[in-house]
Amino acid sequence: MGIFSIANQHIRFAVKLACAIVLALFIGFHFQLETPRWAVLTAAIVAAGPAFAAGGEPYSGAIRYRGMLRIIGTFIGCIAALIIIISMIRAPLLMILVCCVWAGFCTWISSLVRIENSYAWGLSGYTALIIVITIQTEPLLTPQFALERCSEIVIGIGCAILADLLFSPRSIKQEVDRELDSLLVAQYQLMQLCIKHGDSEEVDNAWGDLVRRTAALEGMRSNLNMESSRWVRANRRLKALNTLSLTLITQSCETYLIQNTRPELITDTFRELFETPVETVQDVHRQLKRMRRVIVWTGERETPVTLYSWVGAATRYLLLKRGVISNTKISATEEEILQGEPVVKVESAERHHAMVNFWRTTLSCILGTLFWLWTGWTSGNGAMVMIAVVTSLAMRLPNPRMVCIDFIYGTLAALPLGLLYFLVIIPNTQQSMLLLCLSLAVLGFFIGIEVQKRRLGSMGALASTINIIVLDNPMTFHFSQFLDSALGQIVGCMLAFIVILLVRDKSKDRTGRVLLNQFVSAAVSAMTTNVVRRKENRLPALYQQLFLLMNKFPGDLPKFRLALTMIIAHQRLRDAPIPVNEDLSVFHRQLRRTADHVISAGSDDKRRRYFGQLLDELDIYQEKLRIWEAPTQVTEPVKRLTGMLHKYQNALTDS
């Protein structure tokens, strides 16, 4: 396929984007809005953003969700701007500097919250800055300006959502159904690999792939939840299926690890059962039936605990999977599974990374302010706005540098494209609403094609072009103003890029160490006799951290294996029959305190001291378990955990 070719699957979204832009433009001018450009720009960004992220037409609900986030972010930003202006209107420089800090603060929060919701916080940061900069000459018009911006943005979002509904958005339900079947077959094949106890690299690749697919399925669940209220029951089942899928991975990998020291635990009966190849979910269903009969015949005590747990989790997976596909009423048996355990949310391991993002955004905005005041350039405010936009949106993404490059390419492409519209097309079409709408529809259509291909600069070109062409009411054509706006965008993007290059993000290794220590803390916290604490489901949070670790350190198998071993230790100790008495309960609290000190330690020396203390306490704990005659189901996992911590002590304590 050629570089400028148009694929059939890209046409529908391109038409959808063109329709959203035309609707926003028509409504903006029909109702005599002062700046219809904001409505058009909002419609374009809300519609095109999810398509750029997805690399194609987004699924149903994605545009609506992004629109809601934009509304929330805009309102938060407007309220913050009003508070800042009312408090500091007599000190304009201080007011702008506080806005720069606010933009940095919002970027800091957006780096800590879920990535799906980070857009709202990033937007609220630069919205306040836009308002404060725009009203510099007429501060008394702030409330009116904020209200106009909010209303025009809501109109733009409404147009994007309406266009999405008009062109029958894709439902993700069929993809979810197919992935559920495929995932169960892959889980069975992973257990086959683990029982064969073959090549460790093959097993690592298999479970790593399943972790990614389970994370992707959780993302599909979020999309399905946004799509329609009729999928509420399916959404509840999919939440439980996420935990079950992670449980299956954990039990399979533990089966592999057990065979390193005690291969005789896996009997020939189960080895023969798992030798049967499976291709479809029906094959897996038949095999599970056979296994349940064998377990009933041999008895639970004669069945390895990992296999027993795996068969139970796979059976529950099958039951809930049928419910998701049919979307029928939840049965009593399903309700029992769904009411299982409260899911625990884990604290973010990226606090240092978030602080780097805060300084990058704050410093780049302050640098833009100084540049504006020093040069007195009429479009310095435009450069400042672009700095805030780029840094606020780029920081949350895995590669901020590439996002900046995308914006630079986009603003450079917007200069000749905007020039064509400003000098030729708009002056000749402004007397006819039909021709004006058609001219912008053509722009939206062709950029919509490129956005779906994730063409570098396409998203930036769409936003930058709409931002600099004259779409105000009334239209005024001042070439110097157009050139200033276009150059301001380019300079702003370049200044943001320079700051990102200068303020290096060296938090990667620290984040990795914090993540590994959080795995250790989770394993230690599982040693408890508290009934409420034992019922807490930390598995989704732990695998979410493992997924982050895999993204931060691709190909670093020792780190992944260590993290997975800690997850296995957590699950095994959580279910272990620890003797209930006051002596052990007090010591459990001491172990948790020491593990927390390891995570929060500010220096390597403190961390090593607390980690050494934790190892000593674990040795004492093993002695206490011997005194209280704890069963092997408790002593073996604790011994295995202590051995792992001794082995990887340097990796867990050194920065």
From Swiss-Prot:
Decide whether keyword Glycosyltransferase is in the record.
no
* TM annotation in the entry: 13-33, 38-58, 69-89, 93-113, 121-141, 152-172, 370-390, 407-427, 431-451, 459-479, 482-502
Coiled-coil ranges from the UniProt annotation: none
User: What would be one Gene Ontology cellular-component term for the protein?
Assistant: plasma membrane
Q: How does it sit in the membrane?
A: Multi-pass membrane protein
Keywords linked to the UniProt accession: Cell inner membrane, Cell membrane, Membrane, Transmembrane, Transmembrane helix, Transport
A GO biological process this protein is involved in? carboxylic acid transport
Principal location listed in the UniProt entry: membrane
Q: Does the keyword GTP-binding apply?
A: no
Pfam families annotated for this entry? FUSC
* Record's subcellular location: Cell inner membrane
MF annotations from Gene Ontology: transmembrane transporter activity
Known function: Forms an efflux pump with AaeA. Could function as a metabolic relief valve, allowing to eliminate certain compounds when they accumulate to high levels in the cell.
Family that this chain belongs to: Belongs to the aromatic acid exporter ArAE (TC 2.A.85) family.
Q: What is this protein identified as?
A: p-hydroxybenzoic acid efflux pump subunit AaeB
Its lineage reads: Bacteria, Pseudomonadati, Pseudomonadota, Gammaproteobacteria, Enterobacterales
Underlying gene: aaeB
